């Protein structure tokens, strides 16, 4: 972009001459700009016309002229960035920001949060880390999961606050007597983000790929065949009834991507730009459901965000503030909730070092010591777990004191960061009982394999739970390599048989009851124990409306809205009727 190049040239000039008047020749300027003297004259004239410098020449070749830089590069960069953002030129703004990435946060601060720019409501979110590739079959991060669920549609979907699957690409579905045939009826006039018509044949191609993919196959293991009996009907024939199927088709691994262009979806927002410093979403004009109120959402990746308190930035992944720096004083928590998901401790009985009784003894020590209540983590961030889900009580372990712990145990943990404090506390506690705890860290957000899990006796990690908690926990047992890694062969076989029995129960309350009973067995045996929940919170300035927390601790991009910039607005305004 020519403007960015010109600013870069001016920055080079300012670095060498400063802001004091300087006597200089055109030849010297040409050397600074790496150009001809003729071009240097043109460039100086342009910079003077823009008010960036003053230039007083003298007649005669080789005569020195008086030059003075009138503005600092930082001032110009901020001014130009504002102009580009107001014009909606996000690509130009990104190029401008890349000139000085170390000060990106300072540059962006006045433009973050909800703003009307180029006539459209835009939300800019500062984010503290680079985002993963937005592929539903590979991503692991909480922010990425939220983004992908915004970009891609499924045959069904899970809405914020609603645990039952809702229509999405399919407007209705039917289940045969016996549950072996499911038909999903597609909406007409569906469109991909690139404007191309979305066809049943394309969805069939995508589903056939998902049937064989290691990430999605566990969710679709009961599917014998997928067919297209009509252009607007997807048919699933099962070899075993699976009354979770409508839930499964709304999960991330089963979202529908374009069969030939996987980055293209059919969700409410499309991916307009995906750069290391900027991810930009734009409203999908051909979306088949109610359109979002916001037109554009931008993630500006600013790893050097200032930390001025737990609620002042996105540095902590369970604290999100929507707004610019000047708004932070006005920003108030608009939504708070305790996560249904939790960080957990898993015992690897398959490894053979810990017996079930020793595992129960270890859990008893943790519970009786109050370890989780005394972690050096603010109470506003975590809450010790007493239930796996509401009503699924974590049992208190009681075992004879004379059961000795092994002399040495190995613990493997992965993010989030709070788990590091748990490992330190565990080392101290177990040392008091003659057990040395070796701690290893894995930087990934998902266990890689059974071989990785086999290295450890104890495992610490977190488990996100979505809008349909019971369905999420059932899928966790199927999809996470943790279970095959920690369960003995007989327990693993028992788990598979239990899941097959549960999925065939047509009555949802019965499925929930049986699933709870199985998890109660796992917790009683100390195989899995939730440790603490997160306290999710979103803060926003008064002008942002409709900010609603999702189960994963983000907010529903389709519900947030921003009033247009009128002089006066009535108090207590409500969003327009749909």
Locate predicted features:
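Ligand-site clamp/hinge motif
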Residues: 286-328
């Amino acid at each position: 972009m020519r403007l960015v190049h010109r600013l870069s040239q001016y920055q080079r000039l300012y670095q060498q001459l400063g802001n004091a008047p300087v006597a200089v020749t055109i030849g010297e300027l040409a050397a600074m700009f790496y150009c001809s003297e003729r071009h240097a004259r043109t460039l100086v004239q342009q910079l003077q016309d823009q008010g960036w410098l003053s230039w007083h020449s003298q007649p005669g070749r080789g005569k020195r002229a008086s030059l003075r830089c009138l503005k600092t590069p930082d001032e110009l960069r901020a001014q130009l960035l504002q102009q580009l953002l107001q014009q909606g030129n996000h690509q130009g703004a990104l190029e401008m920001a890349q000139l000085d990435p170390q000060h990106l946060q300072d540059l962006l601060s006045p433009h973050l949060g909800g703003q009307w720019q180029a006539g459209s409501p835009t939300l800019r979110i500062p984010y503290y880390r680079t985002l993963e590739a937005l592929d539903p079959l590979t991503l692991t991060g909480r922010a990425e999961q939220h983004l992908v669920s915004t970009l891609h549609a499924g045959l069904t979907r899970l809405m914020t606050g609603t645990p039952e699957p809702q229509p999405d690409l399919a407007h209705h579905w039917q289940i045969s007597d016996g549950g072996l045939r499911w038909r999903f009826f597609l909406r007409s006039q569906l469109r991909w983000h690139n404007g191309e018509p979305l066809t049943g044949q394309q969805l069939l191609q995508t589903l056939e790929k998902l049937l064989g993919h290691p990430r999605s196959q566990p969710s679709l293991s009961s599917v014998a065949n997928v067919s297209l009996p009509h252009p607007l009907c997807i048919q699933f024939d099962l070899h075993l009834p699976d009354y979770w199927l409508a839930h499964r088709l709304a999960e991330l691994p089963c979202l529908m991507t374009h069969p030939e262009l996987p980055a293209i979806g059919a969700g409410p927002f499309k991916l307009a730009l995906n750069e290391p410093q900027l991810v930009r979403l734009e409203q999908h004009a051909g979306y088949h459901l109610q359109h979002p109120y916001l037109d554009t959402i931008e993630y500006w990746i600013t790893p050097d965000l200032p930390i001025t308190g737990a609620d002042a930035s996105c540095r902590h992944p369970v604290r999100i503030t929507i707004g610019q720096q000047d708004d932070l004083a006005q920003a108030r928590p608009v939504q708070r909730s305790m996560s249904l998901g939790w960080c957990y401790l898993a015992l690897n009985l398959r490894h053979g070092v810990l017996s079930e009784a020793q595992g129960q003894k270890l859990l008893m020590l943790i519970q009786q010591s109050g370890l989780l209540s005394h972690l050096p983590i603010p109470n506003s961030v975590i809450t010790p777990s007493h239930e796996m889900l509401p009503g699924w009580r974590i049992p208190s372990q009681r075992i004879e004191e004379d059961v000795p712990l092994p002399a040495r145990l190995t613990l493997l943990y992965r993010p989030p960061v709070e788990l590091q404090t748990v490992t330190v506390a565990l080392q101290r506690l177990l040392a008091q009982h003659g057990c040395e705890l070796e701690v290893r860290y894995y930087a990934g957000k998902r266990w890689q394999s059974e071989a990785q899990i086999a290295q450890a006796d104890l495992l610490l990690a977190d488990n996100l739970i979505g809008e349909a908690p019971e369905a999420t926990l059932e899928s966790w047992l199927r999809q996470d390599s943790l279970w095959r890694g920690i369960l003995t062969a007989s327990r693993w076989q028992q788990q598979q048989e239990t899941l097959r029995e549960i999925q065939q129960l047509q009555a949802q309350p019965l499925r929930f009851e049986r699933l709870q009973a199985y998890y109660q067995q796992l917790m009683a045996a100390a195989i899995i124990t939730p440790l603490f929940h997160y306290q999710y919170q979103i803060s926003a300035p008064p002008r942002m409306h409709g900010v609603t927390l999702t189960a994963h601790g983000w907010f529903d991009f389709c519900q947030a809205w921003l009033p247009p910039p009128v002089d006066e607005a009535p108090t207590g305004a409500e969003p327009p009727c749909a």
